[in-house]
Amino acid sequence: MSGLFGIAASALRANQQGLSTVSQNIANVNTEGYARQQLELRTSFGGAGVDVAQVRRNFDAWSESALGEAQSQFGAASARNEALGRLESSFSVGQGSLSAAFGRLQDAFAAVASAPTVRGVRTTVLEEARTVAARFQSLDRQLSSLDSQLSKEIGATAERINTLTAQLAELNQSLRSSGESSSLLDQQNRLISDLSLEVSIRLNRQEDGTVDVLLPSGQALVRGTEARKLESPLGAAGPFAPQLSLEGSPRDPSGSLTGGRLQGLMEARAETLAPLRRDLDRLAVGFAQSMNQAQEAGFTAAGVAGGALFSGVDGAAQASAAPRNSGSATLSVAPEAGAALLASAYELTFDGGANTVTLKRLSDGAEVYAGDPANLGADLIDGLRFSLDDAALLSGGDRFRFDPLAGAAGRITVALSDPEGLAKNRAAVGASVTDGGGATPSDLVLSLPSPQALAAPLPRTGTNAPVLEIVDDGSGTLVLEDEDGGQYAFTLGKPLSLEPYGLELTLSGTAAAGDRITLSFASAGPADGGQAHLLAADRALFSDGATAVDEYASLLGTAAGAANRASLAQEAGALVLSDAQLRREAKAGVNLDEEAADLLRYQQAYQAAARVVSVADTIFQSVLSVVR
């Protein structure tokens, strides 16, 4: 009889545990990180009823890992989409755009060309020029503000990561102290899920239930009960500052990140926002230099050579030296007017053993100079002239970085305050020919189209007019040579283009070595508006042929394209995440239909076990009555 009671009692206990397990599952159906519990039973020894083998968590490492990876990718895509959406909105279209301001300035110059003697239209030019400068400055402020916002968000994300890793380290301590617990493991799962959204991680799960958390680089965020802080010192120490630093590690882990909000924010800042800011600065420099060249090549109504229209974008700047430089040399960089400037930063490295410097363009990693540091400034490099104050002060391993256009869009201003300073008149170019005085007198005749609208001012040596001389090039051929040693082959009676001077001239008659041509220029007259007509033209800013409107359209297209790609990536990431969540739920999630069926099954089994107890009691009472 005791065997029957024992079997029934074990059945009651087992099915009561089943009811408790099902109730726990139902209660936590909406609890984040909860893994469904499942009761496992086994036959008691000797066939004396049933025992509870274990209450098992339905935890599947593969589906959890896939979910974590999907969360990291979605976190990165979501952060990138948010950032680039704000970036796209910074570039306005319509009448308030920079492109529209370019158009209105061109229209104002065209009005001056049509009415060169009317002062009012020249005043409009200055007003529209100030509008262009203001648009540049406004756009620069917006992009700078977004840069600052992203830096703060990166810092805040690093703080959230530190909070989560600290909690995981504390949880590891609890697991070591109290042993594995379903509630602690569920809490661990939730923290890992939250952390995966913020940063890409790798997990090393231990037998005692604790977990080590690593970055993709292998650097540990959590090791046992210790958590290491992640910091973001962006912008704190110039171009050589690390993007990320990890407590106790000399390596910058940012390059190894493959997902998470942290990676998405950093990628949006470094790969889209920073290049766009450089492109905007390049546009500001190119536009200002192009306008200034044309302005300086003309004459004002008073017959004075024109001055710069815009300022704030020219001049040499000093490169940043790496903190560990042991030498004391400084590197200066100056953009060349009208050169093909590239939107890129540069890094110069000195090899003391070979006594050479290597200049690398960081946008594509190309080496643009490698050689003697003393010859660095001999030639233009990407439209820039790099110069060391004293190459002897360099020390092995010294490095310099420089972003030649940085901040130009925010600094551009209108240099002119008086509309009478506008160089609306063309240059009337003149020339005089001096016989070389050789044994055979020459009879050289020169003709010039006059007046001319020059794209750039005539080059001069000091205050002297430029002089060109006919020389023998060494092979018996006469060529025209300028003061810088540039030589131009000519044919008598045919037009000769002197590109550096913006001129075309024709030589005829008899030429002899030693003949000299002295160029001069003066205003074409107060009623002339030819130079204003040139200033109104939509001309190429750089050697690639792009105009100001083209460059702005390219900026707008880049921002819009990046934002669109980020939006599509977020949508795709959401689908992948949803699929990973469904797979995880299929393994570890609570299905209420299944739980309802299990609840009914355990309830019926419990009632049947109770009935067995009742039957056993009836039999026992019958036996007692017989005995009595």
Q: Can you annotate each of these PLM segments?
A:
Residues 1-628:
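S/T-rich, low-complexity, solvent-exposed segments of bacterial secretion/appendage proteins
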